[in-house]
Every structure is written in structure tokens, then in C-alpha cells.
Amino acid sequence: MRYVKSALFVVLAIYLPGIGDFPAAGAVPSQTSSPNEVSAQTESERAKLVGTYKLIGRETKDANGTWQSTPNFNSSGYITYSVTGYMGVHVMPNDRTPFTGAQPTAHEAKTALEGYTAYYGPFSPDEDADGKFVVHHRVGQINPGGEVDAKRFYDFASDRLILTPAAADGSKARATRRVLWERLPEVPLSDEAEQFVGFRQLLYTDRYTEREGRQVTHGQQNESRAGSYIIYTPTGHMMVHLMAQEGRTPYDGAIPTAEEALAAYRSFGGYFGRFTVHEGASPPYVVHHQEGHLRPRPNAPTDAERLYQLNGAILRLGGRPRMSNGETTGGHLYWEMLPARPE
């Protein structure tokens, strides 16, 4: 056991595993930058942000310009920044009402999205006259038409990270809300678990059918959600964002209608929590301890078990196979480690 010193790292729908090897992975490109591309200050600021943080509160500015704690704060979530230049966040209101059926009604979907934040992508620290800020380049998010480059001023207070969304004019002085996060410590991970740590993007999914130990069908690679993220961190946490590439229509207004919310819900999925790797099992598997989920769940965390194979930069995940009428069916998700971004 040893402490992880490497990068940080995001699955929703259950897919099932099959037999056979998966594609060999290429080497992950190393991080390179010339002296003209990066300043010592920028390097330092990225390093300062790197980590996984737990949501601990929100504040709003009153008429006198004083920051006040948000009354009845009751949300949970994590934000994580990697040394390779990527970030992800999930924030969920607590005490949500589960759906009455297997699929939500339009009204239930609208309620499920209220107060839920989830997005992912690269990040870039910078500075202007108002202070230091980080831009979250959101390549994926729940809101189909949400802001792509989200500017957040940041400050540190001991182990706390304070993120202040910029005002409409891009300033900090006119900002009226901020979010409080607490840095989490890294934990001892096994050598196998360390290989999970990092940010990966989805390449494709597949499905298969077997009969009497022989593969009778193997579906084509499905790339409809390619580019989604799965993240494993040195703190023992994970999160996943699964987003459809096509068919996501922006809302007509600032708040979605019930039908717009249902369409957004169907095209985006994700959860967050801790992870545990069982490399000694046969076959080996990883458990995603789901503390929060886009789909409202009962208060108790749900454990999602995923069989896995690691092959260089590629991580293959899938649920356990299902057997019915003499046939075994399953599927996989193939995730590739993202390369380090130049600073």
C-alpha cells in the first residue's frame, strides 16, 4: 500500500461483461510544454487547485456586501481537479423523492434536475484585475444549452477552497454567491487501485450473446456516448458522467419545461461516491459506492459492482453477465486515459 501521487479522475447505465480481450491501448502522451507556453505562476496555480474537495456550504452576499451562509443548506457533492488539467463536479440536493416507477414522468424528471449540478471538462487557471480565477471548459453538462466556459474566482482558507462564480460582467466585485469546498486527504490504495486513478473518456460500448460457451452475437461498437468521463481519485472517490453526443436540445428559457427536463434527463446520467477494487476476486471487480446519483435514490448509498480489465490506458468495465433461456448476455464500456494538457 502506498499513497497515490498521480492524477485524479467519471458510469451510469449498467452494462454487462463478456469474454475475450479488448483493444490494445496506446501509450498516454506525456505532458510537455515549452518555457514560452507556461509561466511558473500558472504551473503553481494549477498545482494549488489539484485535489478532490467535498461540498460543505454556500454563501450569498447581502445588501451590505456581507457574505451570509445559505439558509437550510442541504446538498452533497464533490469537485475534483487533476494534475493533468481536467475537472469534474457533481452536486446533489439531499432528501430527494424517488421516482414512482422504473422511468420518470416528465414532472418527476424536472424535479430530479432541480438543484442538481454535474459537468466535466478541462480547466485553466488565470488571473485578472479582480484576482485569480479558473475557467471550467465544460465539454459535457446536464443543461444542454448551459454556459460552456464557466469562470470561477478562487480563494483558499486553510483546507477550504472558495469558488465564486463571476458576475454577468465577468467581475468578482459584483458576484453575489459563492460555494465552499473542503479538501479531502489522499488515502492508501493498492497497486491495482492506483491504476484506476485518473480521468478517462469513453471510447465506445458493445454487447454480446453467448450460448454453450460460444459467442453467437457481438454487437457493433456504439459510440453514441463517446467522450463521456469516468474519474477515479487518489482520495478513493470516483464519479461518472455519461452524456449522449447528439439529440440534446437547449431549453427555450432559463428554466426547463417538464418535457425539456425529461429529454435532458434521458440524455445524461451520472453518480458519485467512493470506490473499492477487489483485484483478488475471480473475476476481479470494482465497487462504486454511490453516495449520490442523478436518479433520486433512497437515503442509503447504493453499491454498483463492475467487472473490469485493465490494459494500459484502457479500462474495460461491465456488470455481471445475465443468463436466460440458455443464453448469456452482457456488454462493456471502454474507457481511455486522457493525456495531460499543456499548461
Regions found by a protein language model. Name each.
Residues A25-A118, P122-E343:
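Lipid interaction determinants
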Residues A7-D21:
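Bacterial N-terminal signal peptides
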Residues M1-K5:
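Positively charged n-region of N-terminal signal peptides that target proteins for export
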